[in-house]
A protein has these predicted regions:
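Conserved alpha-helix/loop element of class I SAM-dependent methyltransferases that forms part
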Residues: 1-3
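Class I SAM-dependent methyltransferase SAM/SAH-binding core
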Residues: 6-49
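C-terminal alpha-helical "lid/dimerization" subdomain adjacent to the S-adenosyl-L-methionine
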Residues: 15, 27, 95-145
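A short SAM/SAH-binding and catalytic strip from SAM-dependent methyltransferases
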Residues: 59-72
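Conserved beta-strand signature within the Rossmann-like core of class I S-adenosyl-L-methionine
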Residues: 87-94
């Protein structure tokens, strides 16, 4: 039993089908996105100022939104505050590969693909942001080790290792 879960940056609730049978609180700063979310408990808020008491959640989940957090250091501190002792923070996101060849290939490939998709969907601004965010977000192995968690595990997965999964235990 994973206990109660905070879905940080829940947006439209993409994780709903996997988590619908659990006690989940969806948090997102965008009220319009939350209105499309199927979770019962929905709260408007940001990761940097979590509106919960200390030790409120057994687990915190954050999927493909960490690069959109304005102050990740503050958000890490807030997640640590609301997690119960022994609780886990599970973070899934994207970054550039570490290998120089893969990094260059990934940069060229994502530039072409994301700009193409942006043009087709008439959302070029959003896809440009996604492309740029892969460069200005520091490598997770450097950034995520600056916290109060123990048993930190960061695993790169997928083609070119540009997707990573971070699991932290409080």
């Amino acid at each position: 039993n994973p206990g109660n879960i905070l879905d940080l940056g829940s947006g439209t609730g993409a994780s709903y089908s996997d988590l619908k049978n659990f006690d989940v609180t969806a948090l997102d700063p965008d009220e319009q996105m939350l209105s499309l979310n199927n979770f019962e408990k929905k709260i408007i808020g940001k990761g940097e100022e979590l509106p919960f008491n200390e030790n409120s959640f057994d687990n915190v989940l954050c999927c493909v939104v960490w690069r959109n957090v304005d102050d990740t250091e503050k958000a890490l501190s807030e997640v640590n505050r609301v997690l119960k002792p022994g609780g886990k923070f599970i973070l899934l996101d994207m970054t550039r590969p570490k290998n120089t060849f893969y990094k260059l290939s990934h940069k060229i490939g994502t530039y072409i693909l994301l700009h193409f998709v942006g043009l087709i969907t008439l959302n070029l601004k959003e896809y440009r942001f996604l492309y740029k965010s892969l460069d200005f977000y520091p490598q997770p192995e450097v950034h995520l080790t600056k916290n109060n968690y123990t048993n930190l595990v960061i695993e790169r997965i997928g083609l070119f290792d540009f997707v990573y999964l971070g699991v932290f235990t409080k």
